[in-house]
Amino acid sequence: MAKKPKSNDKALAQNKKARHDYSILSTMEAGMVLTGTEIKSIRDRRVTLRDGYVQIRHGEAILMNVQINEYLQGNQFNHDPFRNRKLLLHKKEILKLQEETKNKGITIVPLKMYLKNGFAKVLIGVAKGKHEYDKRESLKKRDQQREIDRALKNR
């Protein structure tokens, strides 16, 4: 039996609530400017993306309200868990995000944080908020699909 090819992407944190509360229009990968203790905490999976969002300020994309807990062995050189972090994107990508968020009800949310070739990356998504009935409808569709999959599996 052949070995599976080893994937370089290792998901460290996911924002499942974002996929429930928003319909994702497009996604984009971005790097982050981090300190030493932040990357160590990320590798320990001590990250919360739930309330995070991205703002475009002065031509820079900034990841806000994402909690990266303090590194346990970090002593006096530890970081602030809620500090704003600059995202590393090309100028064209930032301008594209800025144009897309000009529409009412459109926001940018972090969906997933992972390591890629040793570097921490965040998958951000341009999203539009769902109404309550949209959320119920998507739950209903997911349950129906699950039932269909179970029925086909048990055949």
From Swiss-Prot:
Q: Which domain of life is it from?
A: Bacteria
Any one GO molecular-function label of the UniProt entry? RNA binding
Q: Keywords of this protein's UniProt record, alphabetized?
A: Cytoplasm, RNA-binding
Region annotated Disordered sits at 134-155
Q: Does the keyword Oxidoreductase apply?
A: no
Give the UniProt entry's GO cellular component terms: cytosol
Q: Which InterPro entries match?
A: SmpB, SsrA-bd_prot, SsrA-bd_prot_CS
Cell compartment(s), UniProt: Cytoplasm
Q: Fetch the Pfam families from UniProt.
A: SmpB (PF01668)
One biological process term in Gene Ontology: trans-translation
Role, per record: Required for rescue of stalled ribosomes mediated by trans-translation. Binds to transfer-messenger RNA (tmRNA), required for stable association of tmRNA with ribosomes. tmRNA and SmpB together mimic tRNA shape, replacing the anticodon stem-loop with SmpB. tmRNA is encoded by the ssrA gene; the 2 termini fold to resemble tRNA(Ala) and it encodes a 'tag peptide', a short internal open reading frame. During trans-translation Ala-aminoacylated tmRNA acts like a tRNA, entering the A-site of stalled ribosomes, displacing the stalled mRNA.
Q: What NCBIfam families does UniProt report for this protein, alphabetically?
A: PRK05422.1, smpB
Under the heading PANTHER family, the entry gives: SSRA-BINDING PROTEIN, TMRNA-BINDING COMPONENT OF TRANS-TRANSLATION TAGGING COMPLEX
Concerning its family, UniProt says:
Belongs to the SmpB family.
| Protein name as it appears in the record | SsrA-binding protein
The protein's organism comes out as Pediococcus pentosaceus (strain ATCC 25745 / CCUG 21536 / LMG 10740 / 183-1w)
Q: Gene behind this chain?
A: smpB
